[in-house]
């Protein structure tokens, strides 16, 4: 599960992978105390996240092999990077159903689930708007993605 501290907004964002949601908390930077928990966005298996130069959260989704952009002001989300395949999508849907029932899904973590990427997409590195960004997997792959 990933998290991000947004000092400009005094917020802490937390990914809850098994609940398919991103939580937002008010954060008192001086004391570290949290309050006002809300669900910012519902996306499949959110993991690590970063804030881009436009103030949007970019969140890796391992089971969907996608990167989502989430607006912290209103929770609107859309996919900015997609490496999912049809077989991976079917297996992701099975895994999400199992999570909703409180069941495990480890046996679904097969090469088919990961799609075209070399492993489950778990992280990202982003710079300013004119730079490429990078996606990382659970293993050792780091893929450069041009914004052109």
Residue ranges and their predicted role:
Residues 20-22, 65-68, 141-143:
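Structural signal for beta-propeller blades
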Residues 9, 19, 29-34, 64, ...:
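Short coil turn/linker residues within repeat-based beta-strand modules
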Residues 33-42, 77-93:
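Beta-propeller fold detector
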Residues 132-148:
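C-terminal/domain-terminus segments
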Residues 17-45, 53:
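Eukaryotic tandem repeat interaction scaffolds
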Residues 25-32, 70-78, 145-148:
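Short loop/turn segments immediately following beta-strands, especially the blade-tip
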Residues 1-11, 39-58, 64, 90-92, ...:
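Beta-rich, blade/repeat-based domains predominating
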């Amino acid at each position: 599960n990933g998290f991000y501290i947004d000092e400009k907004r005094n917020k802490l964002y937390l990914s809850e992978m098994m609940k398919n949601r991103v939580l937002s908390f008010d954060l008192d930077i001086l004391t570290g105390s949290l309050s006002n928990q809300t669900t910012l966005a519902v996306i499949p298996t959110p993991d690590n996240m970063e804030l881009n130069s436009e103030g949007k959260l970019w969140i890796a989704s391992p089971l969907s092999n996608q990167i989502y952009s989430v607006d912290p002001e209103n929770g609107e989300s859309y996919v900015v990077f997609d490496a999912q395949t049809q077989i991976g999508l079917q297996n992701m849907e099975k895994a999400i159903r199992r999570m909703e029932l409180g069941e495990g899904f480890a046996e679904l973590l097969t090469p088919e689930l990961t799609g075209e990427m070399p492993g489950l997409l778990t992280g990202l590195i982003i710079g300013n708007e004119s730079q490429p960004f990078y996606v990382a997997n659970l293993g050792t792959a780091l893929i450069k993605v041009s914004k052109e």
